[in-house]
């Protein structure tokens, strides 16, 4: 529930679950540009946080990627994952999984509004606009598994 709680606190603080609105309020520069191999990227240049989002994404994909990149700012500020991947043997996959989970929590910060008993995970995934695995992580976060 740690990541869900962080998302809920952020939504309550800014009065919205829209990640782009929150990023602008925080002072994160956002650029929407066409990219071929990336959906989005977060970086900090000269202490200025910056997010680039692939402009070729659907609205649903864009909202998820915005929340995913916001997660890197909220949860992983100061971690240079690209550097770690290229120069060390440290595994950084957990940063991406955490960012995916945070993005799902931003899409549905109040579980009672989106969870229906007995509903297949794929239905939840489709409603949130996330992959099956991310919907499973969300359920594990909500139910503490």
Question: What role is predicted for each listed range?
Answer:
Residues 1-145:
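Active-site hotspot residues in diverse enzymes, especially metal/ion-binding acidic/histidine motifs
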């Amino acid at each position: 529930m740690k990541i869900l709680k962080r998302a809920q606190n952020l939504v309550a603080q800014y009065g919205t679950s829209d990640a782009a609105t929150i990023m602008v309020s925080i002072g994160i520069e956002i650029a929407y540009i066409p990219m071929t191999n990336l959906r989005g990227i977060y970086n900090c240049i000269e202490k200025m946080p910056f997010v680039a989002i692939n402009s070729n994404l659907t609205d649903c994909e864009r909202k998820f990627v915005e929340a995913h990149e916001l997660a890197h700012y909220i949860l992983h500020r100061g971690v240079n994952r690209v550097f770690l991947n290229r120069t060390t043997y440290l595994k950084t996959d957990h940063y991406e999984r955490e960012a995916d989970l945070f993005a799902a929590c931003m899409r549905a910060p109040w579980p009672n509004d989106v969870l229906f008993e007995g509903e297949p995970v794929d239905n939840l995934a489709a409603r949130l606009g996330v992959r099956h695995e991310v919907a499973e992580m969300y359920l594990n976060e909500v139910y503490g598994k």
